Amino acid sequence: RIDEWQQYPDTVDGKPTKWTPHNANGTFSGAAMPLKSAFAQSINSVAVKLGYELGIHNVAQTAHAMGIESPLHETPSLSLGSSDVNLLELVNGYCTVIDDGKMNPPILITKILDRDGNIIYAAEPEEQQAIPYRSAFFMQRLLRGGLTEPGGTTAALWSYIHPVLKYTDFGGKTGTSNNHSDAWFVGVTPKLVAGGWVGGEYRSIHFRTGALGQGSRTALPIFGNFIQKVLLDDRFAQYRAKFPKKPLEDIDPTTYTCESYYAPQEPDSLTAPTDSLGIALPGDSLQRGNASPEKQPEAKTETTASEGSGNHPQASHTAP
């Protein structure tokens, strides 16, 4: 797909309008790029175009099937994360991807034992295949591309994970609101998914610039420090794992082994309707805002971890 300027019909307060997605640097390269590269670099124009091609309603329905329970506004910017969801929902959606498309609602209490070790309560997982294995496999490759693709917005994670790379694979995705008030990062391994959010109680509380407030600068280190400590601790050796080298189903290798040939070094994308000037500021990804495009020339932190046990993820939620 081509990274280019586009307009999409939208509705604001019941009135028809047009909305244009912007990239983090406020420009469009005009280059055709593989989806793997566009995802890794958080190219907003490509994400919105893909969402339109798939159908915004279909995007919303799939998100709900994967574990998102919050209302989703079916506008073009939904592809960039414009609707509010909580961190636990977000992490659970990523768990669905890592569990090969199987969605398990979060379980707070897995079991209760009496003083003699007898089980008096055991949670019963409610697993369902939310998306096809093929789709989950492709998403796993995209998430890993944030680390391996040139210009990937997850590159900063290397400094945290290099001691454990010999026995664990990683992936992840950043996100930042357009005024730098909210920053996100969700990191994945084959056995553990965790997310971090940095923001204020009110969106008037925000970082001054994207360079300071983007997800790769604020939320990514939360995951990085957490996952490093977990995987270096032999008590949690069960979380060390590698992704399969080949898919479990017959999938044409040419559909997921393409390498990037165009990789501008740019900061992550922004979430926006638009800013006050109608352009995007330096930052990361999310956005707001279905119809055919018209082409023309005080901070708080939260962490959520979900255990991808292969069958039934378990989740914990803390708000330091």
What are these regions (language model features)?
Residues 1-59, 103, 115-144:
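Conserved catalytic neighborhood of penicillin-recognizing serine enzymes
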Residues 1, 46-47, 59, 76, ...:
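Extended, hydrophobic alpha-helical segments in both membrane/secreted and soluble proteins
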Residues 37-41, 86-262, 266-275:
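A penicillin-recognizing enzyme superfamily signal
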Residues 280, 284-295, 299:
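Ligand-recognition elements built from short beta-strands and adjacent flexible loops
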Residues 294-320:
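Long, low-complexity, intrinsically disordered segments
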Residues 53, 57-90, 115-121:
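Primarily short, surface-exposed interaction patches in extracytoplasmic proteins
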